[in-house]
Amino acid sequence: MNDLLNKKCVPCEGGVLPFDISEIHKYQKKVDGWDIIKNEKKIFYLYKKYEFKNFLESQIFINKVGDISENEGHHPDISFGWGYAEIKITTHAIEGLSENDFILAAKIDQIINV
């Protein structure tokens, strides 16, 4: 079992450094299928696209993601439509990735694996 599933996101108000690239790659191994992307501001994100059979399945999934995000106090950027949902996760307060991002990614994946 992924040890990230037993952790809870902790509030981040800044003041800590984002993960460096070696930490990012270490944690990336714990979340299957999540890509590391860098936006135009050079901020790292976790990214994953999920595919579904129709709009309703996408919507149900996104609602579950919303519930988990509220419970964890950590909120991804979400876009979805007919048959897909795209999720980007970063820790905005530190403009980069932290353990919280990987915890949330692991918990989101559990929705699909249940």
Where are these regions (language model features)?
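Long, contiguous binding/interaction regions
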Residues: 1-56, 60-114
